[in-house]
């Protein structure tokens, strides 16, 4: 318990005892006590008090939570108390001693029980020289005394009193350090004590906020406090002697930081967005805006109130919305929200603390944007009462008409999108309406073909709706219904055959020129005078013809049921009907002729080839009949052997097994192996019956004990078919032709090779390749050549090695002669003679050829030549006057000359 200095000191021991009891009984649970928790509430105010100014707040402890109390002031003319305990000034007045104290009563409304508490108002001191000099009145806290034992037990007092907390306003301007309270022990009379405080704000972070004079025990604050940072400090005071021994138990000191209105409200968002459906009733919730205040929310400084400062636009009413001043809920208060007129509202919201007091409260603003959402309150309306369109007959998926509507709702929403339906005039469902998603128009489309000859015009009744129902209370106007007049345009249609296909039944075998039926087509265009002509489109067997005018179908060939063009007894022919309209149209029809069978096919033996043994046992031949007719013109069949030739019945016998099968056996004991043609008479069951002699080729062979043929090769050779023989002969002829062509080609190639040999350059041919020397002169007169040597140059034996002697400088060196490939035999000697004569003739007639036959003048080459002077050479002179034996030394190429001019008798 705190007291003012100068109060009766007799209360100090009691306070100390109570404090000691509270410290020792800290583990006990304090009992709740209904009433005011404080004995005195105090507030420090300025000199001038204004009307409506909040002064302080009192708290009432309602333990059971069920009491409803009502506050009253002992000075109702000056002060009033709100339901939450906030004390306001009723009028403006200067603070004086007569207003410094008054009482506040709390009365239970049900039990009428009453409680009271004192309120003390203090004037905020002004720093003058006198006030500085005067010692302020400082509260004093005394350590409780040590309790003595009574009857051997430590006495403990009830905890009816506790040390009240120290209330210190935030943002104090000082001067600092500012004294708060003095802590003292009763033992300071006998002992020299030292005081200290511990805890956050003293020796713990934030350190240095509170300090204590260790000798006097004066507790002071060193700087302004901020409640928004730390709202309460919990310190412990200690008292020790000069030796550091504890002389008092520590006491707790609680310092409450009194909130000051130093923070404005702050909205969580500067711009708030909300929506409300158009046409909403008053009282419809829209949105909630929220602001926070850093000041004490339990005090006036943190109690906010909201209000709407402005609304834009102000139509249809300037007060379309209101706001709950405590919760910030925005609701509608007026009707008439219409999105088609106003799509968005902008509200300026203000939040003010001090419970919205405009004089002392701090305020802030934010913007609330409310969008009016669309509802389906505008039905679609047609732009015209009647729409017109036309469509050619037999056309589908054609847009007939384009329906246009207007809808004031928000485009491309379910409340704007139109849905069209046909409510009348189309019982067969020939039309449908689709919605264009971009323009919202209705596209009337034909979904079923329309026949002009049946319906020439349609009058449709159409209605337009939205994808969602209309808002409550909205009705569809007459403009939501319209009519569509559709005109059908006549077009030239295809002629059609009826029935199609047309089926007729006729016997096969009808002769050419028989009229089968009339196959005509109908023209659906009854109102057009048109002619139809007929043509044949498909007739696989070319049996039919159709009259181009009347459509009569006549045969031009015999109808045959057994034809490959007949499937399942039905012959199909297709015909074309064309009109002369603009444009001309055509249609096809199919005629199906079901051909009835007649007995026009004789039966044949099956199989046509068989084999059996030379003796009747152990096998026989099973045969049946093949008849292209069907019942009853086919089986059962009758099998028999002809009377002629007589060998047939003498050698063979036939036995009927049933209506379809018979058995052929040898009648004699032995028949030589070979191939036999056995005629068999087969008769069907038609009316009249039809017979046929069919040949069965039977191969008779030697058989083993099992009845199997053993001379298969001979039978196979004897039984070779005509086609196989022809194929073999053709192959042989082709091979002979190929061999002959190859021989001719080889001979022609040899001739070409021989001709090329004759055209070879003389310098390249070994047979006449005479070496060139420095002896120059005319041609040789003697042209009596030995052609046999030219024809067979390879027969000439190589000459022996030339003996050592004088050699010409132009003589070929002696070395191994090159081996030339052996040429083919030379052609006829006459060919070579002709070739040489042609060469000579060409050389004589060529003016650019070397003058081999002309007189040439040569320089003298000096002596030493065995030939002497060139002028002495005369090829026409007698050879006997000269010695040509040296030619034998010139090698094999001059051997012939040596033989001709050498020392022989020739």
Swiss-Prot record:
Binding-site list for Ca(2+) 2: 170, 228, 259-260, 262, 295
List of glycosylated residues: 190, 273, 325, 402, 572, 622, 651, 692
Keyword Secreted: no
Biological function: Calcium-dependent cell adhesion protein; preferentially mediates homotypic cell-cell adhesion by dimerization with a CDH2 chain from another cell. Cadherins may thus contribute to the sorting of heterogeneous cell types. Acts as a regulator of neural stem cells quiescence by mediating anchorage of neural stem cells to ependymocytes in the adult subependymal zone: upon cleavage by MMP24, CDH2-mediated anchorage is affected, leading to modulate neural stem cell quiescence.
Molecular function terms, GO-annotated: beta-catenin binding; cadherin binding; calcium ion binding
Quaternary structure note: Homodimer (via extracellular region). Can also form heterodimers with other cadherins (via extracellular region). Dimerization occurs in trans, i.e. with a cadherin chain from another cell. Interacts with CDCP1. Interacts with PCDH8; this complex may also include TAOK2. The interaction with PCDH8 may lead to internalization through TAOK2/p38 MAPK pathway. Identified in a complex containing FGFR4, NCAM1, CDH2, PLCG1, FRS2, SRC, SHC1, GAP43 and CTTN. May interact with OBSCN (via protein kinase domain 2). Interacts with FBXO45.
Cleaved signal peptide residues: 1-25
Name this polypeptide is given: Cadherin-2
Positions annotated as propeptide: 26-159
Lineage of origin: Eukaryota, Metazoa, Chordata, Craniata, Vertebrata
Cytoplasmic membrane side: 746-906
Residue ranges annotated as Extracellular topological domain: 160-724
Any one GO CC term of the record: cell surface
Organism of origin: Otolemur garnettii (Small-eared galago)
Segments for region (Disordered): 863-884
Compositionally biased tracts (Low complexity): 863-880
């Amino acid at each position: 318990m705190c007291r003012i200095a100068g109060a009766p000191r007799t209360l100090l021991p009691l306070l100390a005892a109570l404090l000691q009891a509270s410290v020792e009984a800290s583990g006990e649970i304090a009992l709740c006590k209904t009433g005011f928790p404080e004995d005195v509430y105090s507030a420090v105010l300025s000199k001038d008090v204004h009307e409506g100014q909040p002064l302080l707040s009192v708290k009432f402890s309602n333990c059971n939570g069920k009491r409803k109390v009502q506050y009253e002031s002992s000075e109702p003319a000056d002060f009033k108390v709100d339901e939450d305990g906030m004390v306001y000034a009723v009028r403006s007045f200067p603070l004086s001693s007569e207003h410094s104290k008054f009482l506040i009563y709390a009365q239970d409304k049900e039990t009428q029980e009453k409680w009271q508490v004192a309120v003390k108002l203090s004037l905020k001191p002004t720093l003058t020289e006198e006030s500085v000099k005067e010692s302020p009145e400082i509260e004093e806290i005394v350590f409780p005394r040590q309790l003595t034992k009574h009857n051997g037990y430590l006495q403990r007092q009830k905890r009816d009193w506790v040390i009240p907390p120290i209330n210190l306003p935030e943002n104090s301007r000082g001067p600092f350090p500012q004294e708060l309270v003095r802590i003292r022990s009763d033992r300071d009379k006998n002992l020299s004590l030292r005081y200290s405080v511990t805890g956050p704000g003293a020796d713990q972070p934030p350190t240095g906020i509170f300090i204590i004079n260790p000798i006097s025990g004066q507790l002071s604050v060193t700087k302004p406090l901020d409640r928004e940072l730390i709202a309460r400090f919990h310190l412990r005071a200690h008292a020790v002697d000069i030796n550091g021994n504890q002389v008092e138990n520590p006491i707790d000191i609680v310092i409450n930081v009194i909130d000051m209105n130093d923070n404005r409200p702050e909205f969580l968002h500067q711009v708030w967005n909300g929506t409300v459906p158009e046409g909403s009733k008053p009282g419809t919730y829209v949105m909630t805006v929220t602001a926070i205040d850093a000041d004490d929310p339990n005090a006036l400084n943190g109690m906010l109130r909201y209000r709407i400062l402005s609304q834009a636009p102000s139509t249809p009413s300037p007060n379309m919305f209101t706001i709950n001043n405590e919760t910030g809920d925005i609701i509608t208060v007026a009707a008439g929200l219409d999105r088609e007129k106003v799509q968005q509202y902008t509200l300026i919201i203000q939040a003010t603390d001090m419970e919205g007091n405009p004089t002392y409260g701090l305020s802030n603003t934010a913007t609330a944007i409310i969008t009016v959402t669309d509802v389906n309150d505008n039905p679609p309306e047609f732009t015209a009462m009647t729409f017109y369109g036309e469509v050619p007959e037999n056309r589908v998926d054609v847009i007939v008409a384009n329906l246009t509507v207007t809808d004031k709702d928000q485009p491309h929403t379910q409340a704007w999108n139109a849905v069209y339906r046909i409510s009348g005039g189309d019982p067969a469902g020939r039309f449908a309406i689709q919605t264009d998603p971009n323009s919202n128009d209705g596209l009337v489309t034909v979904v079923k073909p329309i026949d002009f000859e049946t319906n020439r015009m349609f009058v449709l009744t159409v209605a337009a709706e939205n994808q969602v129902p209309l808002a409550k209370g909205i009705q569809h106007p007459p403009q939501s219904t319209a009519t569509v007049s559709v005109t059908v345009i006549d077009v030239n249609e295809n002629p059609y055959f009826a029935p199609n296909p047309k089926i007729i039944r006729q016997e096969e075998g009808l002769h050419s020129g028989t009229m089968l039926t009339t196959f005509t087509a109908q023209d659906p265009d009854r109102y057009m005078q048109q002619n139809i002509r007929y043509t044949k489109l498909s007739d696989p067997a070319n049996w039919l013809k159709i009259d181009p005018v009347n459509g009569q179908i006549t045969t031009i060939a015999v109808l045959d049921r057994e034809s490959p063009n007949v499937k399942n007894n039905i012959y199909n022919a297709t015909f074309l009907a064309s009109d002369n309209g603009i444009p001309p149209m055509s249609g096809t029809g199919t005629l199906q002729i079901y051909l009835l069978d007649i007995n026009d096919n004789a039966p044949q033996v099956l199989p046509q080839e068989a084999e059996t043994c030379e003796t009747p046992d152990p096998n026989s031949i099973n045969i049946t009949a093949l008849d292209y007719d069907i019942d009853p013109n086919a089986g059962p069949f009758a099998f028999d052997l002809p009377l002629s030739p007589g060998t047939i019945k003498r050698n063979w016998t036939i036995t009927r097994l049933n209506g379809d099968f018979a058995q052929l056996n040898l009648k004699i004991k032995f028949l030589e192996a070979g191939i036999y043609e056995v005629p068999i008479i087969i008769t069907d069951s038609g009316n009249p019956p039809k017979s046929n002699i069919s040949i069965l080729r039977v191969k008779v062979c030697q058989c083993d004990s099992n009845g199997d043929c053993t001379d298969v090769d001979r039978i196979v050779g004897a039984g070779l078919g005509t086609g196989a023989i022809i194929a073999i002969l053709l192959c042989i002829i082709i091979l002979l032709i190929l061999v002959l062509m190859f021989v001719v080609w080889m001979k022609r190639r040899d001739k070409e090779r021989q001709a090329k040999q004759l055209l070879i350059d003389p310098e390249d041919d070994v047979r006449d390749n005479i070496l060139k020397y420095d002896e120059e002169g005319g041609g040789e007169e003697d042209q009596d050549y030995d052609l046999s040597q030219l024809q067979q140059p390879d027969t000439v034996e190589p000459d022996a090695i030339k003996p050592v002697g004088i050699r010409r400088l132009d003589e070929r060196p002696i070395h191994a002669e090159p081996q030339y490939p052996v040429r083919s035999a030379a052609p006829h000697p006459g060919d070579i003679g002709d070739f040489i004569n042609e060469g000579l003739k060409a050389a004589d007639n060529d003016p650019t050829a070397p003058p081999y036959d002309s007189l040439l003048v040569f320089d003298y080459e000096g002596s030493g030549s065995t030939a002497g002077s060139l002028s002495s050479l005369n090829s026409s002179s007698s050879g006997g006057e000269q010695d040509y034996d040296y030619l034998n030394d010139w090698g094999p190429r001059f051997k012939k000359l040596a033989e001709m001019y050498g020392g022989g008798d020739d």
